[in-house]
């Protein structure tokens, strides 16, 4: 896939971003990529990593913990981190 054909990082789902990031890591670990291309795909990898971190953070903020009363029955929800 050429650079112009690669989708914008911000438009990728978490799963697609992780898959592309894993592909980049594999290519860099093989060591058979030219220096200029290595730098280019490394920079895309950094952008993918940041995008994944942002998506994970947003997902964590949406997760809620169920509160139970003394009898163990659901009473409501609260943020997972207790905030």
Swiss-Prot record:
UniProt-listed Pfam families: Exonuc_VII_S
Transmembrane stretches, start-end: none
Top enzyme class: hydrolase
Compartment(s) where it occurs, according to its Swiss-Prot or TrEMBL record: Cytoplasm
Cellular-component GO terms for this entry: cytosol; exodeoxyribonuclease VII complex
Any one GO MF annotation of this record: exodeoxyribonuclease VII activity
Domain of life: Bacteria
Reaction(s) catalysed by this chain's protein: Exonucleolytic cleavage in either 5'- to 3'- or 3'- to 5'-direction to yield nucleoside 5'-phosphates
InterPro entries, alphabetized: Exonuc_VII_S (IPR003761), Exonuc_VII_ssu_sf (IPR037004)
Keyword entries, A-Z: Cytoplasm, Exonuclease, Hydrolase, Nuclease
EC number: 3.1.11.6
Single Gene Ontology BP annotation: DNA catabolic process
Keyword Nuclease applies: yes
S-S pairs: none
Family: Belongs to the XseB family.
Subunit structure and binding partners: Heterooligomer composed of large and small subunits.
Function: Bidirectionally degrades single-stranded DNA into large acid-insoluble oligonucleotides, which are then degraded further into small acid-soluble oligonucleotides.
Protein's name in the database: Exodeoxyribonuclease 7 small subunit
Organism of origin: Rhizobium leguminosarum bv. trifolii (strain WSM2304)
Gene responsible for this protein: xseB
């Amino acid at each position: 896939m050429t650079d112009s054909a690669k989708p914008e990082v911000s438009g990728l789902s978490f799963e697609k971003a992780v898959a592309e990031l894993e592909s980049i890591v594999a290519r860099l670990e093989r060591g058979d990529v030219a220096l200029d291309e290595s730098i280019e795909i490394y920079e895309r990898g950094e952008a993918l990593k940041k995008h994944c971190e942002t998506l994970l953070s947003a997902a964590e903020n949406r997760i809620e913990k169920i509160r139970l009363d003394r009898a163990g029955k659901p009473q409501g929800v609260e943020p997972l981190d207790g905030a």
